[in-house]
């Protein structure tokens, strides 16, 4: 890699996130976009939602507007249906991703297609560059089987967006971004190349 990848980066902040709710009462943990970390450009928001109590998610996210950024929803467990004002619709299931570019504006909903069981996943908001904020809205539904997996010593990398070890993920961001789901067994480690000019964060959701 270039010089930008030849030094270790220091962790400058550790936060626990804010337990809150959004939509029609969906319980979640807000990591970015809360009082501890308002934003980390280009990351505007990062939420984890997860519960096996349907009362925590059954209300879903009724129609609401987005504009000027991208939303990436990564579903670990469960099933959601998304639908928008242009007539587009699709489903999020175990391990799948929905990549929505809101651009000049869209109204959409994300509603659970289950009445019991575990519903767990993440939503990330990415800011669009100023010159792209008024582009037409678009969607990319990415099934779990389209996300490459890389076996590493003591672990696994799912490449949602970006490139690592020559493997590219299916996500296509208008802003440069890497998005990996990494599993490591105890006492193992991994080095991830990140340009020195980029902001980055790690979220530990198990372990």
Show the residue positions of the predicted features:
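Long amphipathic alpha-helical segments that form oligomerization/scaffold cores
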Residues: 128-155
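Ligand-binding loop in jelly-roll beta-barrel domains
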Residues: 103-132
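A short glycine-rich, His/Asp/Glu-containing loop-to-beta-strand
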Residues: 22-76, 147-191
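Conserved metal-binding segment of the jelly-roll/cupin
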Residues: 92-107
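Glycine- and acidic-residue-biased ligand/ion/polar-headgroup-sensing regions
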Residues: 67-87, 94-97, 192-207
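Short, Lys/Arg-enriched N-terminal segments with co-localized hydrophobic residues
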Residues: 1-6
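Short, structured patches in soluble enzyme cores that scaffold and shape functional sites
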Residues: 123-130, 159-163, 183-186, 205-206
């Amino acid at each position: 890699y270039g010089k930008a990848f030849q030094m270790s980066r220091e962790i400058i902040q550790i936060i626990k996130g804010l337990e809150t709710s959004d939509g029609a009462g969906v319980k979640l943990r807000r990591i970015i976009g809360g009082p501890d970390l308002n934003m980390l450009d280009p990351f505007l928001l990062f939420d984890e939602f997860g519960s096996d109590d349907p009362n925590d998610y059954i209300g879903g996210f009724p129609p609401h507007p987005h504009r000027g950024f991208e939303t990436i929803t990564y579903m670990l467990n469960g099933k959601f249906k998304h639908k928008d004002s242009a007539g587009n619709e699709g489903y999020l299931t175990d391990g799948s991703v929905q990549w929505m570019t809101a651009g000049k504006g869209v109204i959409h909903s994300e509603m659970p297609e289950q009445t019991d069981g575990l519903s767990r996943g993440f939503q990330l908001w990415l800011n669009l560059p100023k010159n792209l904020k008024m582009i037409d809205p678009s969607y990319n539904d990415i099934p779990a089987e389209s996300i490459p997996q890389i076996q590493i010593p003591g672990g696994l990398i799912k490449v949602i967006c970006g490139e690592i070890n020559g493997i590219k993920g299916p996500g296509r961001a208008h802003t440069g971004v890497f998005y990996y789901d990494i599993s490591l067994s105890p006492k193992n480690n991994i080095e991830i190349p990140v340009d020195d000019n980029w902001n980055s964060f790690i979220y530990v959701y198990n372990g």
